[in-house]
Every structure is written in C-alpha cells, then in structure tokens.
C-alpha cells in the first residue's frame, strides 16, 4: 500500500503541484510585467537607478584584509600584473603592491615585501580581494598606493568599487604601525571618501597632508551609468586635506580637466608656496596651479615645459636635494612613442626646465611608474612590463645617473624583476 501511495504521489500529485507552481509564477510575472508597462520612461529610469544604488552599496562593505594569502594567491596562480606602488618603511623594508587578474572588474590587490633593498622579494603576503560569487555584479579592488607618513606609519590606500567604476567609487585606507615586523598588524579598513587615488600624499610646509583623490569625470560604467547624479559636481580631481595626521580628510578643492581620462593626478608644493598639480588626460599631461594651498585652481593647460606623454600614468616627486624627479614614457622630453620606454629627468626650477634623460627601460609596453627616495639618495622606481604574462620591474639609480644619462653609481641597477606571474593564461 505504501509503495502505491508513493507511486501515485510521484506520478500524479507532484506534476500537478509543479504545474500549479509554474502557473502561479507565470501569473506573478504577468503582474510584474503589467506594473512596468504602466510606468513612464522617467519612472522606469527612476526604478532602475534605485535598484542599482542598492547594488552599488555592496562596495560600502569593508573588504577582508587577507594576511595569509598562500597558497591561493601564490605566483603559480597568477597570470597578470599591473603596477601600483612601492614604498620604504623607516626600518628599511620595501613594500610593493600590484593588481592581479586583469585591469577589469575582476581585479584584486596583492602586496609583497623586500628586506634587501629589492634584490629579493617575498611571496604575496597581503591580498585585498573584493570578489564574491554571492553578489550579482563583480566587486573590484582596482588601484592603490603605499605611503610612509612623517610619523613612520605605513598607509595602503586602495579603491573598492563595483564593475570597475560604479559612478561613485570608494577610497579606503589601512595602516600599520609595525610594517617592519615579521607579522605586521593592519588596521581595519576605513572609507575616506568617494573616488580613488593612485599617487602618494604630499606633506605641505604648513604641516598639512594633501591627497590627490579623483572622482572620474564619468557617470559610471555599464548598468551604473547615471546612478549617482548628485556626485556630478564633484567629478574631477578632489583635493583632500588632513590637518590631524590622517585621522580625518576634508575636501578642499576640485579641479576638472578637458579630455578627461583616469586622472591619476600628482601634487607637489613649489618653492614659492604654490601647489602644482599634474594630471593624465587623453591628450597628454596637463597642469594646474593653486595659490592658496588647494582651495582654488587655475584653468588647466598643457605643461609649460612641453612634456609629451601618452594617456598613461607618469610620476613626479620632490627629492631631498630640492630637485623634482619626473618619470615618463619616451626617451625624449618632448616626444613619446606610446607606452614604450621609460626615462628619468630632474628639474632645478620647479618644473620649468628638465635635465638628464636617463633611459631606465628601453623596452615596449612599460607603464605605471611609482617610486621613493631612500635615505642614501638612491631612487627606486617600480613599473610593469608587458602586464600579462609580464612582470613588475624595478629600477634603482641616483641623481648623478640621471644627469650623466647613464649609470655611474655602483649600486644602481635597471630592469630588475620584482614580481613575475607563473601561471600561463588560457
């Protein structure tokens, strides 16, 4: 009898229940369709925007700081590298970070360290990966920068957003008071502002810290386009300032640029007290000046020194000698051939003229330089070569090398390999 009951249920009852369920879902779907059919175009757009704003809020969830990333993120699992940042701690450790997977919505951040001036490097020892199979659109950690502040604390700034850029972005930071220890302790992630940043902060003569964040002059990628219209007045380079050693950051000024791209702006303080901002555009490097520590900015223009550069990241930084350092694509100051070759230049007049022209890498497909100056005057520059399946490269040189146009310092080395992915991309 029990077998007959089970047979009856399987053959007759369950199909009926399934059909009833399908019928109910069909009715519900028709009701939903009717609801949308009654909406005007403006009402539909408003509905979509509200929905995408809820999805975008997934980027507001603090990411996990993974300090035990092996073996999941070992080099034999990696097939792509995009250079982000390099920095030295007070104890002499060098930290390096890069992007894995791709320059796309699936990217994540990895970091390694060196205790012998960049001769050898650890395996990945810190990873920030916002991806999750439980969310409808990919969460992206796409750019970042290490910076040692005047107190000796190491910062790692990074961007967490959705779908590469959701129209809002998100600049986050973690810090470590013991970055030279065997197991550094990192603070909980703190969201600083909308937008992102790829350049180190600058400490002004006033003691203020200036951070060149940027909110893309773009409404958002893909389904997020137009999701945050209230942020449109803030699109451009957002000059964030801290007067309390990074406890808080406040927006001081905004500078937009024509032909905008990923701004990747840099700020240095000139000897006359003005701030000099340089930024990436689709037409090359443009500049703007602030006479009041970042509140107001001049209309942007191409550099007075006629620095020719592709739409790609460059590097400008004040050295301890007082000179400015420039790292650019191309072997000549007034010429480039796309994202090929890197050269180093020095300025003794706050960027009006440049000397040197040391070619630190003569290969094609070299991009995204970042660097620092060690206490002994050695300049360290990291960048990527042939992103996937390429390498994160490192150059060590001095001001004397730049002025000579060749290596004259015994400790200088070029085209060193810091990170190389070992997995073959399918």
Give the label of every model feature segment.
Residues 2-7:
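Sec-dependent signal peptide recognition
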Residues 10-18:
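Hydrophobic h-region of N-terminal signal peptides that target proteins for export
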């Amino acid at each position: 009898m029990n077998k007959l009951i089970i047979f009856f249920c399987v053959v007759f009852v369950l199909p009926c229940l399934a059909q009833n369920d399908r019928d109910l879902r069909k009715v519900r779907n028709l009701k939903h369709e009717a609801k949308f059919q009654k909406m005007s175009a403006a009402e539909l757009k408003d509905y979509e925007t509200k929905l995408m704003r809820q999805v975008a809020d997934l980027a507001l969830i603090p990411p996990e700081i993974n300090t035990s990333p092996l073996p999941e993120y070992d080099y034999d699992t990696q097939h792509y590298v995009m250079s982000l940042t390099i920095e030295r701690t007070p104890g002499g450790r060098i930290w390096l970070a890069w992007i894995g997977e791709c320059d796309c919505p699936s990217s994540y951040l990895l970091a390694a360290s060196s205790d012998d001036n960049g001769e050898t490097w650890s395996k990945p020892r810190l990873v920030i990966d916002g991806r999750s199979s439980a969310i409808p659109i990919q969460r992206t950690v796409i750019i970042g920068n290490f910076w040692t502040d005047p107190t000796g604390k190491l910062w790692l700034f990074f961007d967490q957003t959705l779908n590469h850029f959701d129209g809002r972005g998100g600049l986050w930071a973690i810090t470590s008071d013991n970055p030279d220890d065997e197991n550094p302790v990192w603070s909980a992630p703190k969201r600083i502002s909308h937008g992102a940043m790829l350049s180190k902060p600058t400490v002004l003569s006033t003691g203020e810290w200036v951070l060149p964040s940027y909110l893309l002059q773009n409404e958002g990628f893909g389904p997020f386009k137009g999701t945050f219209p209230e942020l449109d007045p803030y699109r451009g380079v957002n000059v964030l300032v801290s007067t309390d050693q990074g406890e808080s950051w406040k927006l001081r000024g905004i500078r937009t640029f024509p032909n905008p791209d990923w701004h990747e702006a840099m700020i240095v303080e000139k000897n006359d007290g003005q701030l000099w901002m340089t930024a990436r555009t689709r037409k090359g490097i443009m500049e703007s000046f602030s006479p009041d520590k970042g509140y107001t900015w001049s209309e942007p223009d191409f550099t007075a020194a006629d620095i020719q550069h592709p739409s790609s990241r460059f590097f400008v930084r004040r050295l301890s000698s007082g000179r400015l350092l420039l790292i650019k694509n191309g072997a000549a100051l007034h010429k480039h051939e796309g994202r090929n070759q890197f050269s180093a230049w020095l300025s003794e007049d706050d960027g009006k003229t440049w000397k040197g022209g040391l070619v630190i890498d003569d290969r094609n497909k070299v991009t995204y330089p970042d660097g620092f100056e060690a206490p002994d005057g050695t300049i360290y520059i990291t960048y990527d070569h042939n992103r996937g399946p390429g390498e994160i490269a490192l150059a060590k040189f001095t001001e004397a090398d730049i002025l000579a146009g060749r290596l004259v310092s015994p400790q200088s080395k070029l085209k060193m390999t810091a990170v190389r992915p070992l997995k073959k991309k399918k």
